[in-house]
């Protein structure tokens, strides 16, 4: 990378890049996800336990117990569902809670499952209660109870289902009803990743996308990726764009720093919205405490977006804390933003 580009003084002419055509990137994006458990990086304890459950299911020749993954977005819940299906050599049928509006929608999916298939339901906490209720006998006895007709002529029909495994994913496990949650034999939480684990993921992705990157460059991206592989891979792709424009053959630490500065991602991984949340909390509400709804209105953001996307990382980093009276900024947040307490 040129000295001028590194300082961000002027944009160079767009140079002929040595990187492959962008269509090749799009074709390779689908292969970023690991397909085997041994290729999955991070979540060590969960991974070791899952290996035991998979081997036990294979040895018994039975469907694996119903599994619920929960944790913040982008930590690998969908990837693990795909890995389970690949490891067991069965089909993976994917849907999501909001899509299943009527019980008939779920019944149609369940009756078409083959033996030991995996049914993956993302955002399972958003599944309507009427749909959820027909799942109970399906999960316990592999039977479907359907009501045909109306009024006095209505009758119940039992349909036998093939043994299957339900894999649910949620960012809000507290919104799943107890009857449904209790029917999962395996419940696993996905934690944020360490910068070292994220750097390994970035190095793996860079090999798949044919983007040469130094170890220091990968570590720097990992350090700013909010503990989330999805964000790490997204930042790598954006840094790749800067490398292509500047004609850099290799993504190094200098280029990463320049690109992330342009993308407004600071050394702690906070973006513009993270800093806005903290700044509003400090400057408008004297650091808090303030209710989440009031904070959301002040930031022109939805409550759920703050709770699911921004708040978990800010709390984990020690920039924000929850109290019975509302959210508060910490001393660490004041120092990070160079504001006076």
Curated annotation (Swiss-Prot):
Region (Disordered) residue spans: 1-22
Positions annotated to bind Mg(2+): 78
Cellular localisation: Cytoplasm
Record keyword Transport present: no
Keywords: ATP-binding, Cytoplasm, DNA damage, DNA recombination, DNA repair, DNA-binding, Hydrolase, Nucleotide-binding
Residues the entry annotates as binding ATP: 32-33, 74, 77-79, 140-142, 183, 193, 230
Its job: The RuvA-RuvB-RuvC complex processes Holliday junction (HJ) DNA during genetic recombination and DNA repair, while the RuvA-RuvB complex plays an important role in the rescue of blocked DNA replication forks via replication fork reversal (RFR). RuvA specifically binds to HJ cruciform DNA, conferring on it an open structure. The RuvB hexamer acts as an ATP-dependent pump, pulling dsDNA into and through the RuvAB complex. RuvB forms 2 homohexamers on either side of HJ DNA bound by 1 or 2 RuvA tetramers; 4 subunits per hexamer contact DNA at a time.
Domain free text: Has 3 domains, the large (RuvB-L) and small ATPase (RuvB-S) domains and the C-terminal head (RuvB-H) domain. The head domain binds DNA, while the ATPase domains jointly bind ATP, ADP or are empty depending on the state of the subunit in the translocation cycle. During a single DNA translocation step the structure of each domain remains the same, but their relative positions change.
Protein's UniProt name: Holliday junction branch migration complex subunit RuvB
Native organism: Lawsonia intracellularis (strain PHE/MN1-00)
Gene: ruvB
